Amino acid sequence: MSVKASTAAELFMKAADVHGTRVAFGTRLKSRLWKPTNFAELYEEGACLATALIDMGLERGEHVGLLADNRIEWIISNCGIQLAGAADVPRGTDVTDADITYILPHADVRICFIENVELWKRIQVLKSELKGIETYILMNLDQSAPEGVLHLKDLIEKGRALRKDGDRRAEERAKAVQPEDLSTIIYTSGTTGSPKGVMLQHSNIMYMIDCIPVDLGPHDRALSILPVWHIFERALEMFSIAMGCSTYYSSIRMLGDDLKNVQPTFMGSAPRLWEVLYMRILDNAQAAHPVRRFLFHTGYGLAEIYKNSLFYLKNRTPHLHKPNPILFSLGWILHLVRWILVTPLYGFFNVAVLERIRQAAGASLKATISGGGALPRHVDQFFNYVGIPVLEGYGMTETAGPITARTLNRLVIETVGPVLEGVEVKIVDLNHGEILYPNPKNKHMGKGLRGEIHVKGPIVMRGYYKNQEATDKVMKDGWMNTGDIGMMTFNDCLKILGRSKDTIVLASGENVEPVPIENRLLQSPLIDHVMVVGQDEKNLGALIVPSIEGFQALGFESMGVAELADHPDVEKRVAAAIKQEISAENGFKSFERVTDFRLLPQT
């Protein structure tokens, strides 16, 4: 039974009642030994903390700093802050000194949770710039609090004693929280200036967790590996709480072991994780006995044919242009015949070969939602073809997480899936500002037309904290300009093409989106990093870092990046790879061709 709530505080309270003694979170004690915390314990610890915070003078609506990584103390602290009617201002322990001294004062933080003593030592050096902070609370239960710092466990015990005497201020505060109240202020990275504080209401986050397209229940297990202060991972953890799912705090280093011993049925993930796993699988296959290598390539080749035809039959291939009914029907028949013919062989190799890949990459996974960046096409295809459903989503901090997401029934590779229920998306012309999609004046309502993505709905932020100018730049009449370029496909899925600010305008006046070109070039095993350039030039160029692993496979042994960049044969092979990838056959126009490039000796 899932929990429906209008605020995070209500969610914690109801989850304790509904899910009770079921495991809410698992914390690693040893390699395969986990300490469980059930839903009732999570709420009670949070309520004790909230009581102590209120007793200290924490006001409703106040902003509380929360500098920590994924750990049980994070969710307990967050629970306490939410129950007390306050809003958290989270960041990881890798936060820079510059961000600490900007974010905490800007957010008007008076009380700040810190994960460990090491972070406290950094803060001591910066204290002259953090004069508004009156109280620091150490979270790590294995460390003693330095002088002048409170300890989380002491506050919980203080709150426990107060509650034992009948103190119920935590419940009173929690019930007073309204959906339109602030739940969190998340500061986005300030790559072009100071970080901006995204104000998210309880209603934003609660609506989001109702839209996550995965069916979970009390018997499901999730791994937490993405930074919990990011809205994507945070929304997934709140979703798990609502569903009664058990969440285990893992890490990239322990992921391989945890996929086997926890056997998760769900997890949030990032493209880089799948890229690393993809390369590891390919490296293992390449190093295997020739017979095993043959079986691997044969098995995957059959899976590619089988799934490619199956996706065509189920309308799961991205239609960027309106399909010709006759050609589509003919293709449907041909794919049906091919699918029938390959099924027996695929069935054998699926059990004998592909099952081993699934076991290594998480055979128990019902699905994983990948966010935070675009999945490379070849990686996307590989895992979905071998039978690991990767549901790519698209969103941002300003929208409390996903705007769109694939579902198991709408798993269209190379897209980020359909728009979430209750959310509106429009595609806007970059030059004239006219609505391209949905527009009844345009052919097919504007499907297949490229433009800037704007979004509206209950997931959109209130604005940037104390920064009306930045808010006005991206918000107009409830619509938020994402700054991303995309199109709606003819099977009603969104396809991301790049960033509007990344658009290159050639001397001819042609607008070029570099991201699709860069993503295609990265599919070559010879290219490790690439940046397409060419603003105001006649043609496009590229800055390329050659791949050590890719060239080692071709016999360029014991050579570093600098040596590869100076090697004439490397230059010839990269030129051939560029010509092969950026071609008309792969859907690129003549002005999108890369006519010049430079090999860089380092990243």
Question: What spans do the regions from the language model cover?
Answer:
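Conserved AMP-binding A3 loop
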Residues: P36-A40, S183-I209
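Conserved AMP-binding/adenylation subdomain of ANL enzymes
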Residues: M206-S224, V228-S329, I333-L354, S364
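Conserved C-terminal "lid"/linker of ANL adenylate-forming enzymes
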Residues: I504, H529-V533, K538, K579-T603
